[in-house]
Amino acid sequence: MIRHVKTIALLILASGLLAPLAQAQDMDVIQRMKDREEIEHLMWRYTRALDTFDPDAYVAVYTEDGAFGQVKGHDALYKMIADLRASREQRAAEGNPPPEMFHATENYWTEFVTKDHARHHAYWVTYYGANGPDAPARMIQVGRSVDDLVRVNGQWLIQSRNVAPQD
């Protein structure tokens, strides 16, 4: 009888000691799920900013020293998107409006390097929208990306974006 009481007491003690550990693990899982959702939203904002040629929204998803390939830093990233927008507006003014552009990201996976550093892997497709009711949308480019993301002041941002990794 005493042996059973000791066993029961040890089980109760162990469950009391393990409960905080289980709660901590649950909190880690919840945080990781929240991080994944925030990263998914970050990448949606990136795509939307690119497809609407919005330089302010585009630089807002990058760290101050963020890079898209060889284009590095907010000023250079802003100029890249502003120049694309100006070129499109110029073509439209000349009577040759370019079709709308759409990017789709598929089969993405987020790898957590540390709690504040993630690597986002994805396949992407670029489409040109129809220029008029009789013109079909066209797939113009496909590829794969590997992006390094970091948490800065509680917010996930793109540190570097590589849309043509060599591996």
Predicted ranges, named:
Residues 23-52, 56-64, 75:
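Short, low-complexity N-terminal intrinsically disordered segments enriched in polar/charged residues
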Residues 43, 104-108, 144-145:
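Short structured motifs
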Residues 15-23:
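C-terminal segment of classical bacterial N-terminal signal peptides
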Residues 37, 99-101, 138-140:
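Transmembrane beta-barrel outer-membrane domains
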Residues 1-10:
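Bacterial N-terminal signal peptides that target proteins for export
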Residues 117-121, 140-167:
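Short beta-strand edge/turn micro-motifs at domain boundaries
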Residues 55-125:
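A solvent-exposed, acidic/Ser-Thr-rich amphipathic alpha-helical stretch
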Residues 126-130, 149:
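Beta-strand elements of well-folded, non-transmembrane domains
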